[in-house]
Amino acid sequence: MSMNSNAVKRKYQKCVDRMKNMKKKPEFHGSDLEKIADYYHLDKEKIVLFGANVNPLGLSGQVKKDLAEHLDIISSYPDRDYTDLKKAIAAYTNTSLEHIVVGNGSTELISLLISQRAPKRALLLGPTYSEYARELNLVGGTLEYYNLKEEQDFRLDISDLTDTLKSDIDLLIICNPNNPTSSAISTADMKKLLTVCRSLGIFVMIDETYIEFAPEGTSLSAVSLVPEFDNFMVIRGVSKFFAAPGLRFGYGLTSNQAFLQTLLTHQNPWSLNSVGAYAGERMLKDTDYIQKTWSHIDSERTRMCTELSGLDTVKIYPAYANFVLVRILKEGLTSFDVFEKAIHQNLMIRDCSSFESLNGEYVRFCIMNPEDNDRLLDVFRSL
């Protein structure tokens, strides 16, 4: 008995020692370039940002030229009402000027909306962008998730959701197309949902950050429903589609005039600076850049999904945004393992372990240029 006991103790101690010596998974956000480059001893300038979801075409050359010729605008305050910018937004979205609010990025508008609605109970379609939960926690309400189902390819079952909704829900938050699943809700289904929410007194926030990347953008956007429903607000920005995350320009659309006035009352004056207002106006009018983006994303997204569909080590899901969610099917291989395989090739994808309801089997990557996309395909082929 004593020999057996000692053997067990020695075996246990070996396991403990092995666990201590194992490389600890680093603590960083999947898109934290500085920390990731430092941890893996990489030159950050050489890392391809497959986790950032930003348009690979970069900032429009025409917008760069226009900005260079109008730098004197820095010496002037922006128009407090952002009249010219709102006219550009109205033309771009085919909406009325009176329905528009301009902000310092979509993040400011998300924060402003949540703080002013101050929901006691909020429902999020998950898994989704973590900033919604962070803002909701700041106002102290109860937060719940309605999780999209993997077996349904993360598509929303609109009937099941509407059956779930109750009148004690104050706010419903939807990202469409959704991050990180890249799934989307049609305008027709969104109309059904808004109708039910209106009857229950539920306000809906729809984040359309990625809608312009969708192959059927106009049949997915809720913008056309703005005049018909006053119980929701669409929020968009230019960080992703127009490759301008440093500009911090976003806008919201709602026909709820009372709520719109509340937002304006609590928003800081000149929330968007002169450069942001001017550049935003030029971006929305740059039809050549918009067309080139649609063409590039559509062709490369189709190619990447076709290639990955032929591998038995991964599963991909229908993608409506400029990014693709991938499930790792190979036994014993985690999302972090795949992240590390990619980062050692200077390719930074997103390990989705931190997303609500996603375990360590999922990664996400965005569409980049063909050469870098090929390099990432090689990583997946090597699994």
Task: Give the label of every model feature segment.
Residues N4-A7, A188, H344-L347, S354-L383:
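PLP-dependent enzyme catalytic core of the Aspartate aminotransferase-like
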Residues N4-S76:
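N-terminal "arm"/small-domain region of PLP-dependent enzymes with the aminotransferase-like
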Residues L59-S60, D81, N231-Y317:
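PLP-dependent aminotransferase class I/II
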Residues P78, A90-L112:
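Short loop-beta-helix segment that forms the pyridoxal 5′-phosphate
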Residues Q116-I174:
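PLP-dependent aminotransferase-like
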Residues V139, S199-L200, F229, Q345:
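Helix C-cap/helix->beta junction micro-motif
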Residues E150-A214:
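Active-site phosphate-binding strand-loop segment of PLP-dependent enzymes
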Residues D298, L311-Q345:
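Conserved PLP-binding catalytic core of the aspartate aminotransferase-like
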